């Protein structure tokens, strides 16, 4: 077991997946398979692999069947499934992060596909950071059309976000401090990436930990890349 006692998790799975639908997938985005396993299943299994059994998951209102599938598939877990169509990634994040459990929360987007061993290494490293800090998973694998570049100092502390020509970008997995979970953002913020920048500017201690192989699964080519990584020999 990698996680600390009582650590809860959150999964953001409320996006529409429009580009995958245009590419021919007929299932909701969380149910898109990579190497035969739906994204939502592989994400949940990553949380289970680090010892987290209490999860808050948000899906949109067109994904009620997905919510029912998750509850049936993982009946042994303590799941809080929110069925709500949100206006933004930030709203979805706040729905998940607002769960009643105290303390830090490990949050992942459903389309941040990575192998369990890489996920486990990230969580192990992130938990060694100060409890009052938020830790971002960052990756050198830049396949996103609009990546959020991260600049860090030699100790891994994040010094700037949304930097040009980055060597590392956010990977869609976050260990969020209790403070950051409860802070009310300014009303003009609409996207999670903007919220992260605001947290950093507001004095939130923020660190980055590298996940070498993580894919933001938004397009057909992303599915192909994730499947090639799934078939490759796991890193050690």
Identify the meaning behind each predicted range.
Residues 26-41:
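Short catalytic helix/loop segments, enriched in acidic residues and glycine
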Residues 124-127, 142, 157-236:
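Catalytic-core segments of class I nucleotidyltransferases/pyrophosphorylases
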Residues 1-25, 204:
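N-terminal nucleotide-binding beta1-loop-alpha1 segment
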Residues 7, 53-54, 103, 132:
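Short acidic/polar active-site loop segments enriched in Thr and Asp
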Residues 54-60, 136-138:
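Short internal beta-strands
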């Amino acid at each position: 077991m990698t996680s600390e006692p009582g650590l809860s998790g959150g999964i953001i799975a409320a996006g529409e997946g429009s580009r995958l639908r245009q590419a021919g997938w007929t299932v909701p985005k969380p149910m898109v398979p990579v190497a035969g396993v739906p994204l939502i299943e592989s994400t949940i299994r990553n949380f289970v692999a680090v010892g987290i059994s209490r999860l808050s998951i948000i899906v949109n209102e067109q994904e009620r069947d997905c919510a029912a599938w998750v509850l049936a598939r993982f009946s042994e877990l303590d799941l809080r499934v929110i069925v709500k169509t949100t206006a933004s990634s930030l709203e979805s994040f706040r729905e998940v992060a607002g769960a009643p459990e105290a303390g830090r929360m490990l949050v992942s987007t459903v389309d941040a596909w990575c192998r369990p061993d890489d996920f486990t290494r990230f969580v192990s490293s992130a938990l060694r950071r100060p409890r009052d800090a938020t830790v971002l998973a960052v990756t050198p694998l830049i396949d996103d059309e609009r990546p959020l570049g991260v600049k860090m100092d030699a100790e891994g502390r994040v010094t700037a976000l949304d930097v040009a020509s980055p060597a590392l970008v956010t990977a869609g997995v976050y260990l969020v401090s209790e403070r950051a979970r409860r802070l009310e953002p300014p009303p003009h913020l609409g996207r999670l990436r903007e919220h992260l920048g605001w947290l950093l500017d507001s004095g939130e201690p923020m660190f980055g930990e590298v996940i070498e192989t993580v894919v933001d699964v938004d397009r057909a080519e992303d599915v192909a890349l994730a499947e090639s990584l799934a078939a490759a020999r796991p890193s050690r």
